[in-house]
């Protein structure tokens, strides 16, 4: 009987250890090519592959948790998951409430409207309706730079909903990550009549230092492990292999 109880205790301990090895990773699967789903519902994309590479380095298993973008940080604080790997910009505002890893990519944002739209500055879009992802840095930029010029800013729970409403004529355009809007809209048939206007947007006042992995404050050991993992995959070729699946340039940035 004692041996049986000991065996059960060991099994429970092993199960507990296996559970502890899982790293719950929040993603918004509506953000192609960074986080989206295959036809069978499997999470995929640049962010997903980076998360799996990091998990491999720190010897933990990634378990992906789908989350609406605007609830990402509240969900992290509520311990619904351990980290956010979903194109989360490292900004001063966010650093006040959560911690970040070192950056793992940095790409510009851009305005997308119908081709032929004359643009010399925000005032050129006066009277137009521009859709943005709710809670995003692009929303911050649009509210700070476009709204004062008379542009109506319409926040959405998911970026793919923005594209649907552009095609339906309910929106005139969007402000989005330049790579995401290319992969998720412009390169598709429904985006063929639209294009970029204005300069690429890098303003750190809105967009911060690049994209990092978000985690709760005080997780010093996890942060150190993840930062080392990012350094390792950058140096051993894993990062480049992942990047080449999705891009024809180095998304790490300058």
Spans of model-derived segments:
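Proline/Glycine/Serine-rich low-complexity intrinsically disordered segments
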Residues: 21-254
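Sec/Tat signal peptide C-region and signal peptidase I cleavage site
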Residues: 1, 14-22
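Bacterial N-terminal signal peptides
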Residues: 7-15
């Amino acid at each position: 009987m004692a041996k049986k109880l000991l065996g059960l205790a060991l099994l429970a301990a092993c199960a507990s250890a296996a559970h502890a090895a899982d790293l719950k990773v929040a993603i918004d699967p509506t953000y192609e090519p960074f986080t989206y789903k295959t036809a069978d519902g499997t999470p995929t994309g640049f962010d997903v592959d980076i998360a799996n590479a990091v998990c491999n380095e720190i010897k933990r298993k990634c378990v992906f948790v789908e989350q609406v973008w605007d609830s990402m940080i509240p969900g992290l604080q509520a311990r619904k998951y351990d980290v956010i790997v979903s194109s989360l910009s490292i900004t001063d505002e966010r650093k006040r409430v959560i911690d970040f890893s070192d950056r793992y990519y940095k790409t510009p944002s851009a305005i997308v409207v119908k081709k032929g739209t004359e643009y010399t500055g925000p005032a050129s879009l006066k009277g137009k309706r521009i859709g943005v992802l709710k809670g995003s840095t692009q929303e911050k930029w649009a509210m700070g730079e476009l709204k004062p010029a008379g542009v109506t800013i319409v926040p959405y729970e998911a970026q793919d909903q923005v594209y649907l409403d552009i095609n339906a004529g309910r929106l005139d355009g969007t402000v989005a990550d330049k790579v995401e809007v290319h992969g998720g809209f412009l390169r598709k048939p429904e985006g063929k009549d639209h294009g970029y206007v204005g300069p690429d947007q890098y303003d750190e006042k809105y967009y911060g230092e690049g994209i990092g992995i978000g985690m709760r404050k005080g997780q010093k050991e996890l942060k150190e492990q993840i930062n080392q993992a990012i350094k390792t995959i950058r140096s051993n070729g894993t990062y480049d292999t992942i990047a080449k699946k999705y891009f024809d340039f180095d998304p790490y940035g300058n």
